[in-house]
A protein has these predicted regions:
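Active-/binding-site microenvironments in catalytic and ligand-binding cores
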Residues: 1-144
Length: 144
């Protein structure tokens, strides 16, 4: 589990790009949690209307630099910024339905108000037939 704190590096409506992850090269990372700091706005228009979003280029970058990555979690309502819907659609497709490579699962709207470290993370989704998404509960804990 790797946690990247971008809370001092992102602004409203900004695209989160591969350059922001140039210092992460842990080939063992299977879960990447991206903390933007926008969780403090949960329940407000600011949280839903002005958050940053993930660039579609991140999916390719993560596949190249984090070969064991299976899942990305964010403290944003969606990886798609409300103000940049087309790029958001591309990002969802790039992560979940890549033309080549494996899917990288997404967990959106996470509560990431701690910095870890975590030894184990359990993701328990509500399984719904023929759905392209579902609510899930995430448990994170440390052995120490």
């Amino acid at each position: 589990v790797e946690i990247v704190d971008l809370s001092n590096n992102v602004a409203d409506r900004q695209l989160i790009t591969p350059e922001m992850f140039s210092n992460i090269e842990n080939e063992k990372t299977d879960l990447l949690l991206i903390k933007t700091g926008y969780g403090i706005y949960r329940g407000s228009d600011h949280y839903t209307l002005t958050p940053p979003g993930l660039s579609s280029k991140l999916a390719v970058y993560f596949r190249e630099h984090l070969p064991k990555l299976r899942c990305v979690g964010v403290d944003l309502i969606s990886i798609s910024s409300y103000s940049n819907r087309e790029e958001g659609r591309k990002a969802h497709h790039a992560f979940l339905n890549p033309d080549d490579g494996k899917s990288i699962l997404l967990i959106e709207d996470m509560k990431l108000d701690t910095n870890g470290p975590f030894d184990k993370v359990i993701v328990a989704p509500l399984l719904i037939d023929h759905a392209d998404g579902a609510p899930c509960t995430v448990f994170a804990y440390t052995d120490s």
